[in-house]
C-alpha cells in the first residue's frame, strides 16, 4: 500500500484547501484565565517569517524568548523556546502574526504538545506594551495566586449569578461590549478567605 500514501496525502491536502472557508470565532478569555489555563506563558519577539509544513498543515514562527512567567516545570530540561506552532489556516483558528516589527515583545500564552508551544487565534497573544501595568503585574506575579482556588466566570447575558463562592463574575463583555474592559485590565479573581474568591485590584498590589 506504500505507493498510495503520497496520493492519499495529496487528496487530504486538496480536501483541506477546497473546504468551505469558515471563520474561527472565539471569545477572548480574561488574562487570568489565559494564564491559569496555559502550560506556558512567555514574553517573546517574533523574529522569523512563518514556515508551513505541508504534511501536518501547521506553520511555525521563529521567536526569541525574553522572559518566562509560567512553564518551568512543564518545559523540563529545555532551556529555551525557539518556535511557536499554529494551524496553517485561519478557518481552523490558525494564528497569523501581522506585526512586522521584530523588536516588539509579545505576551504569549499557549499549550505544550510534545514539548512544542502551540497557539491559536483564541490564545492570549498581545503586544507587551498594550497591556496595562496591572495586567503586567498579574502575569508577572499575581494571577498564579488565584489559579487553584478561583475561577473567572463570564457573564454574557442577564440574569447571571455566581455558581460558587470561588467564582468571580466577569461582566466586561455584557456591560462594556468588550473583553478588554475594566475587570480585564485592572482586576484579578483572588482568594479572600477559604471558599471565597473576590475581584481584587492589581493596582493596590503594585510595589
Swiss-Prot record:
Annotated site residues (Involved in metalloproteinase-binding) in this chain: 37
GO biological process: cellular response to UV-A; connective tissue replacement involved in inflammatory response wound healing; negative regulation of catalytic activity; negative regulation of endopeptidase activity; negative regulation of membrane protein ectodomain proteolysis; negative regulation of trophoblast cell migration; positive regulation of cell population proliferation; regulation of integrin-mediated signaling pathway
Keyword line: Disulfide bond, Glycoprotein, Growth factor, Metal-binding, Metalloenzyme inhibitor, Metalloprotease inhibitor, Phosphoprotein, Protease inhibitor, Secreted, Signal, Zinc
GO CC terms in record: basement membrane; extracellular matrix; extracellular space
Signal peptide region: 1-23
Domain NTR: 24-147
Principal cellular location given in the protein's record: secreted
Molecular function in Gene Ontology: cytokine activity; growth factor activity; metalloendopeptidase inhibitor activity; zinc ion binding
Disulfide bonds: 24-93, 26-122, 36-147, 150-197, 155-160, 168-189
Tree of life domain: Eukaryota
UniProt-annotated binding residues for Zn(2+): 24
Localisation: Secreted
Gene3D superfamilies from the UniProt entry: 2.40.50.120, Tissue inhibitor of metalloproteinase-1. Chain B, domain 1
Glycosylation, residue list: 53, 101
Span list, region Involved in metalloproteinase-binding: 24-27, 90-91
Modified residues (Phosphoserine): 178
InterPro entries xref list: Netrin_domain, TIMP, TIMP-like_OB-fold, TIMP_C
Family from the record: Belongs to the protease inhibitor I35 (TIMP) family.
Role according to the record: Metalloproteinase inhibitor that functions by forming one to one complexes with target metalloproteinases, such as collagenases, and irreversibly inactivates them by binding to their catalytic zinc cofactor. Acts on MMP1, MMP2, MMP3, MMP7, MMP8, MMP9, MMP10, MMP11, MMP12, MMP13 and MMP16. Does not act on MMP14. Also functions as a growth factor that regulates cell differentiation, migration and cell death and activates cellular signaling cascades via CD63 and ITGB1. Plays a role in integrin signaling.
Protein name: Metalloproteinase inhibitor 1
Lineage: Eukaryota, Metazoa, Chordata, Craniata, Vertebrata
Name of the gene encoding the protein in the UniProt record: TIMP1
